[in-house]
């Protein structure tokens, strides 16, 4: 809740007469995928700031937390559309590699030892079950406790995309979606 942030600001302000300096309170709307803090940083909101706190509502008090390193990805697979009932042999499903990718991610989790995760959704999976989809899309987020590990997970993920496309005779492309976040440690 944003009210937690404002209450913390009021509490710190109450002891300011004993301290030198000033206090500023920033809210970051649309933080999940919106790049709130990154945009504010790029526009100088934190210039001259000596100390910063991140406050996030939770059902418990957490003092020593880590904000994940994160990159959001959009992956598109391209096949050849066809009528599934009449000419299925003419089609190359763009959905098949996307489904394989999700299976591959599930298996890769076993190797990551809790150091990160890849989460995703099918954002475009075709329009009608009777048509073999020519294009399908997934949206993913790659997250880890460190940029180094996140880069490794991202590399594993892109290799899985390539493998899924090769296995199904499709093509693919990817792009970053939004802002990359570095890990933040207390």
How does the language model describe each region?
Residues 95-186:
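Metal-dependent amide/peptide-bond hydrolase catalytic core
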Residues 3-6, 12, 17-133:
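Histidine/acidic-residue-rich, glycine-tolerant segments that coordinate divalent metal ions
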Residues 1-7, 53-74, 153-157, 161-170, ...:
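Short N-terminal signal/transit or membrane-insertion segments
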């Amino acid at each position: 809740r944003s009210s937690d942030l404002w209450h913390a600001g009021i509490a710190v302000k109450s002891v300011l007469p004993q301290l030198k300096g000033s206090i500023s309170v920033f809210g970051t709307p649309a933080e999940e995928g919106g790049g709130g803090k990154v945009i504010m940083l790029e526009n100088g909101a934190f210039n001259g700031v000596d100390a910063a706190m991140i406050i996030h509502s939770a059902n418990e008090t957490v003092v020593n937390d880590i904000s994940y390193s994160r990159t959001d990805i959009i992956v598109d697979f391209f096949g050849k559309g066809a009528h599934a009932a009449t000419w299925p042999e003419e089609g190359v499903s763009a959905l098949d590699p996307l489904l394989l990718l999700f299976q591959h991610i599930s298996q890769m989790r076993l190797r990551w030892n809790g150091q990160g995760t890849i989460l995703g959704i099918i954002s475009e999976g075709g329009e009608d079950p009777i048509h073999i989809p020519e294009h399908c899309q997934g949206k993913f987020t790659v997250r880890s406790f460190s940029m180094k590990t996140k880069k490794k997970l991202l590399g594993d993920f892109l290799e899985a995309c390539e493998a899924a496309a090769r296995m199904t005779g499709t093509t693919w492309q990817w792009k970053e979606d939004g802002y990359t976040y570095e890990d933040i440690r207390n």
